Design a protein with these regions (language model features):
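Short gly/ser/thr-rich secondary-structure transition/capping motifs
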Residues: 119-123
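Conserved N-terminal beta1-alpha1 strand-loop-helix module at the mouth
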Residues: 1-90, 95-104, 108-110, 115-116, ...
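Active-site/ligand-binding-proximal alpha/beta "capping" segment
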Residues: 138, 145, 153-199
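A short, acidic/glycine-rich surface segment
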Residues: 124-128
């Protein structure tokens, strides 16, 4: 919350025919994290990257892996992603059945030496986080409905970032707040960073840019300006 701005490009938007080239580009850009979207075709209407991909990605880069699990029954698969090399794991609170499951997920991630995070869809009330906020390293606020890249930012998502920041100020001032969906240096970065976001996920905004390295730097600089 209001910490150093971190950029976490979404690898789902990379050129998979030139994958290692894009990884080296992210390293050259000084990206802080690599965002890995895992979708199962059930929790969200798309099917994407899985455990073997995370393991192979971990083998070719030292950039920390920010793994976002958009899957049903995440407790069943969570150990696989922890073993594969995730450095930070976000689980959707909507995919967990009750308080016991939420706490078990956080404990499992923490016990593996990995940083735990909870993710929220745009229609999930922020106050559901209150019992867990002190046990988390990060909250992921979705500013689009998860499932497909390239969507437009949902207006007012910055208000939800502010609500998370208010909880963090009371219970966990070191909490990171990540925002994913329609993030652009020209417009939405300022909105979310003014409210407390400090981790920015961008897919097409980085990989489809004429100069992806400059795009990463522009996101970081726009966030710093908004925080000033």
């Amino acid at each position: 919350m209001f910490g150093d701005i971190k950029v976490s490009p979404s690898i789902l938007s990379a050129d998979f025919m030139n994958f290692e080239r894009d990884i080296r580009m992210l390293e050259k850009a000084g990206t802080d994290l690599i965002h890995v979207d895992v979708m199962d075709g059930h929790f969200v209407p798309n099917l994407t990257l899985g455990v073997p991909f995370v393991k192979q990605l971990k083998a070719i880069t030292d950039v920390p892996l920010d793994v976002h699990l958009m899957i049903s029954n995440p407790l069943e698969q969570l150990p696989w992603y922890l073993d594969a090399g995730a450095d930070l794991v976000s689980i959707h609170i909507e995919a967990l059945d009750d308080d016991n499951q939420v706490r078990e997920a956080i404990r499992c991630i923490r016990d593996a030496g990995v940083r735990p995070a909870l993710a929220l869809k745009p229609d999930c009330p922020v106050d559901v986080l209150a019992p867990y906020i002190s046990d988390l390293d990060m909250v992921l606020v979705m500013s689009v409905f998860p499932g497909f890249s390239g969507q437009s930012y949902i207006e007012g998502s910055e208000d939800r970032v502010g609500q998370v920041a208010a909880l963090a100020q009371r219970f966990n001032p070191e909490l990171l707040i990540e925002v994913d969906g329609g993030i652009s240096a020209s417009r939405t970065v300022g909105l979310v960073c003014e409210q407390g976001a400090d981790v920015l996920v961008a897919g097409s905004g980085v990989f489809a840019a004429a100069d992806p390295i400059a795009a990463v730097q522009a996101l970081r600089e726009a966030g710093k300006v908004a925080q000033a």
